[in-house]
Amino acid sequence: MWPLCFLLNKLLRVEERNQGILDGNGDSTFPKYCLFDDPLVSDGKYRDAGLPSSSHMDVPHVHQLASWDCGLACVLMVLRASGIASCTLEDLAEICSTNSIWTVDLAYLLQKFCVEFSYYTITFGANPNYSIEEFYKEQLPEDLVRVDLLFRKAHESGIIIQCRSVSIHEISCLLLSGNYIAIALVDQDKLSKSWLEEVLVSGLHSSNSCYTGHYVVICGYDAVRDEFEIRDPASSKIHERISSKCLENARKSFGTDEDLLLINLENMRNQNGY
């Protein structure tokens, strides 16, 4: 078995992230580098790996202004946490020029502002199978071509997309390192009921069980409670905590592709003198 300190060092080698991409069939088209080498973490004993039992990053809360701009609000939270204050939701919306926001759109926004991040998904491109979901039905035919083109142009634009699932343990370890936050695509209907009752934006949550795509920022983890701290752009609460099980169910729901943008916030703050 590898020493735990060696595993931790492998976890934090984000600087080498720009060496890989996978196509939609899982075939490697460029030399691949995987940010995570599945950490051997069990029973929440993070102290043994030199990690604290809890950690959170200071991320200012930003409310979304419409039912479709939660992803833009999450990007704005990342920018403000990085020390980039000269930007608004309206600015980001103008750059995107669409109100059908996909994770790849958020990746291009982060790239435009020189944010260091890693992009993970289990599906390369837009999944046509989502046409059966009410959430995607109206926009998907139009989005298929646009989104697929963004994926195809990602590598030449400097965006590395890794086609793999990221475990909840990997996410918790990176958060406990105190250097990272994440933007995650989740199914809002699978989040806790008590949390959803606090949403500000009307019409965002319904009583049915259909998939409702939503973006949140994950900015902390408590290993003792097994809870993640998040920033929800639709919530009236600035600080939210959610159980590991609830987050896992919400982000692995059919429709999310397990999309995850992992941001090295510490490096960004150092670069911006924040």
Curated annotation (Swiss-Prot):
InterPro entries: GUCD1. This is Guanylyl cyclase 1. It catalyses: GTP = 3',5'-cyclic GMP + diphosphate. One of its GO terms (molecular function) is guanylate cyclase activity. Its cofactor is Mg(2+). GO terms for biological process: cGMP biosynthetic process. Functions both as monomer and homooligomer.
